[in-house]
Amino acid sequence: MAEKIDIEASKNEDFNKLKLSDLNKRLHTIYQGGGEKRMAKLKAEGKMTARERIDALLDPKSPRIEIGAFAADGMYKEHGGAPSAGVVVVIGYVSKRQCIVVANDATVKAGAWFPMTGKKNLRAQEIAIENR
């Protein structure tokens, strides 16, 4: 009986590791924003990415969490996709005060808004209001 449980637990662990690996691959793609080409163009112009701008604003080594990285995942394929709905939202600390920061991602359709972009911005505002 214990052997059967161990085999089942091992199968579950392998399944979960595979799913976690898939999620991490998807996140890596999402973090590329509009793609390597657009990221390179942004860098050539001397600009920072949305995530870099947020990191520069937030207190160093302070806790932070990104909200909605998977927003619009798989949507708007006819437009080339909209990773993170074209906007990065992070809860973090500025001058030791917790806040929510929103930055448009210029690498995603030059910062154009999609319907999910508006929803994500509204959700960021709701979170800020709920946690005043």
Language-model segment annotations:
Residues M1-R132:
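Terminal-region recognition feature
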